Structures are given as structure tokens and as C-alpha cells.
């Protein structure tokens, strides 16, 4: 689930990977095609396409699949997908933003609404929770590309707003309008990032108890299982004990 590092282990736990693997490549391919259609098929000139290709590589998507997805956009032989944002609430009053790409708005709306309802959540009007999030750019590098001080200095010089460095790597956050320049400057200095793109970042997170946390995890999984859903962003935090338990 994009935008929430706590879920890295949970969403990749044993069994979960096999359950979603068949859908991962199709979703990645769809994003590549959409990005190439909206911009240029040259990733060096299209930040969104570059981000989509990096995400595909991170999931070990074959090069042929990536090239095929780009050609679908160039050849104009693919479906025309509409990008839609849904907003809603989960157990405990948690807020969620869902990004989808669809060729059938009515079908997707019905599927997303059903996913919320069956898991104890509720779909809300557009704008109901978006004000709790900021649209920001994120660029992430491996820990060994630089030490924390060097990365911080470079990121600030490039115009970034925040840098978090730990054993897992460096995550740089910047304003949406500055994303292109910041990512370009950092890539020129440190090379290709592990991931990059625009996300919805919660302004504040709410703590939930473990029982509510498990319900929210199930809600997110059900929503992400929808074929048209690309990303889910949340504003809740889980206890370390629950993260360890659910990631087992």
C-alpha cells in the first residue's frame, strides 16, 4: 500500500504475496500505459512514467511486459482509462484515500463502495477526507548511496521539505510543485532512486488499538484487491506488536 511504510511487511506476508501476485503486474502495466498516454513514452521526459517503470522493476516485472505496456499507449490500441479518487472512513474513524483507474466508472464505484461496506467502512463524498492529507512528492534511495548528513544537505539544496534516513534508506519529501526539480537534482547526484512519485501523505496520524487495527488492515486488503484500484492511503498508525503479528 503506497504511502504507509508500516504495511511493507504486512502486505508482503506469506500467503498475501501469492494472493495478489496475479494482479500486481496488470496494475503496474495499466499505470505504465496511462502514464505514457498522458505524457510522452520517453521516461527521461516523463516523471510519472519513470516512476511507474521503477515500481515495476521493484516487483521484478519482466522488461518485455514493461515495453509492451508502453507500446499500448503509443499504438493507441489500449483501453482509455479514467482516473478517479475515492474517499472514505474505516473503523475507528480512520480516513482513507483510494486512487483508481477504470474504463467503467459505475463498475468501479460499485466495487469500491462494496469493499468499504463489507469491511466496516463507509464511502464518503469527494473532499470529505482529502483535506487531512497533502499531495507531495517522494523520492527514496538506498541507505548506501550517501550518509544521512550528505543526503540532508543535498535534499535541502534541491528544495525538499523533509528527509528521513535510517537503516532502510533515505526518504525525501517535497511539495508537489517542486517534485520535478527536486527529483531531477537528486537523481543527477545519487543515481536512480528505489522509488519515486506523488503520494497522499497524512498531515497527522491517529493511533488505533489492535482490534481496530486488524479491521483496518482487512479493509485495506479488500479495497486493494479490486482490479481497478491502484493505491490506498491512510491516516492511522499501528502498534509495533500488531505490525509484527500481522507480518508473520
From Swiss-Prot:
One of its GO terms (cellular component) is cytosol. One of its GO terms (molecular function) is DNA binding. One of its GO terms (biological process) is regulation of DNA-templated transcription. Keywords: Cytoplasm, DNA-binding, Transcription, Transcription regulation. It is found in: Cytoplasm. InterPro entries: Integrase-like_N (IPR017856), TACO1_YebC-like_2nd/3rd_dom (IPR048300), TACO1_YebC_N (IPR049083), Transcrip_reg_TACO1-like (IPR002876), Transcrip_reg_TACO1-like_dom3 (IPR026564), YebC-like (IPR029072). NCBIfam families: PRK00110.1, PRK12378.1, YebC/PmpR family DNA-binding transcriptional regulator. Belongs to the TACO1 family. This is Probable transcriptional regulatory protein Mpop_0922. It comes from Methylorubrum populi (strain ATCC BAA-705 / NCIMB 13946 / BJ001).
